[in-house]
A protein has these predicted regions:
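Short, surface-exposed patches at the edges or C-terminal ends of soluble domains, predominantly
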Residues: 1-313
């Protein structure tokens, strides 16, 4: 029996309704977990306030966008020197090819800003012979509970009181494990955030101070490090900045102390008051229905908003 066009349309809408009301909630329920640390979602553990702060600042003019698939598009940027690639919480490792692209991008003058801790951020940090120490960092100078550590960040000579949430230490490895740089490129490391002298790394993960733990010296442990790149000719190139607390820019922490002022000033110190800011959204999706749906919805957001979408398939 043939189905009329009218009946076909009714069946189509009925199918869509069933999928929307029944199948989608079920599939969403079995997804591993919701995406987090996204610049385009408004949950407490996302970073949309960070993005909005950059977009709405009266003191700057940034074009803010996102990379949805992989950093390969960095090879196509026409002016890397005015571009900042922001990575918050690396939930999947960068491949060797992606690291080579990041190295070329920085050799061309591009900058990166990495917020990491217990994740895969070391895949990038090792390019600069540093690492995120994946043991709990304790400090006797804490606030309210042991997880919240107040400290001071120095940006362009100005001090900012900031509040960290379960940071880890950054260790200088001295020698390089991963070298993808062209010959002659150099960088200068500078610590701009550190803990108090009364801090220690819980090396045995028992929550106590024991002989096995690493106690800080008078300078505390580094939790913020800046790497300034120089060409073989000595010309200043891009900057790589590492902050060992992926929760610092999340919405819940945005208004704590001077966190928001610090983050906006940090961006300005890297690319000035104008330029491109690209959030790497490719590290916040998984191979699941819920993650795929989130990424598709994010693509529709750019399409409907008329914003520039930077993506690589």
């Amino acid at each position: 029996m043939e189905i009329s066009s009218r009946s076909g349309i009714m069946i189509l809408f009925a199918t869509i309704a069933v999928c929307t009301l029944v199948l989608f909630p079920l599939l969403q329920y079995v997804a591993e977990r919701d995406p987090q640390l996204s610049a385009y979602d408004d949950d407490w553990n996302d970073i949309s306030n960070f993005r909005k702060g950059l977009e709405n600042s009266e003191d700057s003019n940034y074009n803010v966008s996102a990379v949805l698939s992989n950093p390969g598009v960095l090879d196509e940027i026409s002016d890397p020197s005015s571009t900042l690639f922001v990575i918050v919480g690396t939930e999947s490792p960068y491949s060797s090819l992606e690291l080579e692209i990041l190295a070329r991008y920085m050799e061309s003058g591009g900058s990166i800003l990495v917020f990491g801790d217990y994740d895969y951020s070391n895949t990038i940090a090792e390019l600069f012979a540093i690492e995120f120490v994946k043991h709990r960092l304790w400090d006797q100078n804490y606030r309210d509970n042991l997880s919240l550590i107040p400290t001071t960040a120095i940006v362009d000579g100005e001090s900012y009181n900031i509040l960290l949430n379960e940071p880890v230490a950054i260790r200088d490895l001295g020698s390089q494990y991963v070298n993808l740089w062209s010959q002659g490129f150099e960088w200068n490391k500078q610590i701009f955030i550190s803990t108090s002298k009364n801090s220690w790394i819980d090396s045995d993960d028992d929550g106590l101070i024991t002989p096995e733990d690493e106690v800080s010296g008078p300078q505390g442990f580094a939790v913020g490090m800046r790497c300034e790149m120089k060409s073989p000719e000595g010309n200043q190139l891009g900057t790589a900045v590492f902050v060992s607390d992926s929760s610092l820019p999340i919405n819940m922490m945005w208004n704590e102390d001077r966190n928001s002022d610090f983050l906006l000033k940090l961006i300005e110190s890297m690319i000035g008051t104008e330029g491109e800011v690209l959030f790497d959204e490719s590290r916040h999706t998984q191979e699941s229905f819920g993650a795929s749906l989130f990424q598709s919805a994010l693509g529709f957001y750019f399409l409907l908003a008329g914003d520039t979408l930077i993506t690589q398939v």
